[in-house]
């Protein structure tokens, strides 16, 4: 939180851009940022095309009396498209005349707060959300280059999370940690597969819903010697 640092790295497999530094030197607020892109998305690789990138960000806001607040987020995009042999005379295997695609999206973000008490104790609370999506499919070609789909997948998952942890150091040898987590989970799934070649897709799994999960824990650590 004292000075800005910026970094750009270029390698065989990707590009990495990072930056960190103060948002406000007076209030000691700071940020950290990182972005990566895989150069495989720019290359014509045998067998398919891959494209990957991710982004990470965290903002830190310490206060004099109310503890430290932080806002964070992370996300990624991962894509793959396979190549198929367009020359039918070179078809030797079933995979030579099939083309598949996969797209994966993931994101998470939240707000955290940490407060330190005067008795060697701290309380950390986080409210967060996560999201993931997988979109995939596969297509089969015949010798006339007519295509028919034989698999289609679309799944989405969303989690809303609230978690808090109380940590207390009673002595150099004894520490106790207590906390709980509440998660509300949402899902949507659509999966269809063709039972045989050139036949229409049939639904294998389809549905959506949500459920909740509560978990609590208490743990203690005892040291055999003074730290």
Regions found by a protein language model. Give the residues of each.
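Flexible, solvent-exposed coil segments and beta strand-coil junctions
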Residues: 1, 34-43, 50, 83-95, ...
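Predominantly transmembrane beta-strands of Gram-negative outer membrane beta-barrel pores used
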Residues: 1-49, 54-62, 70-74
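Short, solvent-exposed beta-strand edge segments and adjacent coil->beta transition regions
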Residues: 3-5, 54, 96, 108, ...
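A short, polar/proline- and glycine-enriched secondary-structure boundary/capping micro-motif
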Residues: 18-20, 81-82, 135
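Glycine-rich, flexible loop segments associated with nucleotide phosphate handling
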Residues: 28-32, 95-98, 150-152
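Face-selective signature of the C-terminal outer-membrane beta-barrel domain
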Residues: 60-78, 100-227
């Amino acid at each position: 939180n004292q000075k800005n640092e910026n970094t750009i790295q270029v390698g065989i497999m990707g590009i990495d851009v990072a930056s960190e530094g103060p948002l406000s030197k007076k209030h000691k607020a700071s940020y950290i940022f990182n972005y990566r892109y895989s150069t495989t998305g720019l290359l014509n690789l045998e067998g398919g095309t891959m494209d990957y990138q991710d982004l990470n960000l965290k903002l830190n806001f310490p206060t004099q009396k109310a503890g430290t607040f932080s806002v964070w987020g992370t996300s990624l995009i991962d894509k793959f498209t396979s190549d198929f042999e367009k020359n039918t005379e070179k078809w030797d295997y079933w995979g030579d005349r099939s083309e598949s695609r996969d797209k994966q999206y993931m994101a998470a973000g939240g707000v955290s707060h940490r407060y330190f008490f005067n008795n060697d104790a701290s309380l950390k609370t986080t409210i967060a959300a996560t999201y993931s999506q997988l979109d995939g499919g596969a297509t089969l070609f015949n010798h006339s280059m007519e295509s028919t789909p034989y698999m289609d997948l679309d799944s989405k998952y969303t989690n809303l999370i609230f978690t808090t942890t109380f940590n207390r150091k009673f002595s150099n040898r004894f520490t106790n940690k207590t906390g709980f987590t509440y998660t509300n989970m949402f899902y949507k799934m659509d999966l269809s597969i063709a039972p045989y070649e050139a036949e229409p897709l049939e639904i294998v799994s389809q549905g959506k819903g949500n459920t909740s999960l509560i978990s609590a824990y208490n743990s203690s650590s005892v040291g055999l010697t003074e730290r």
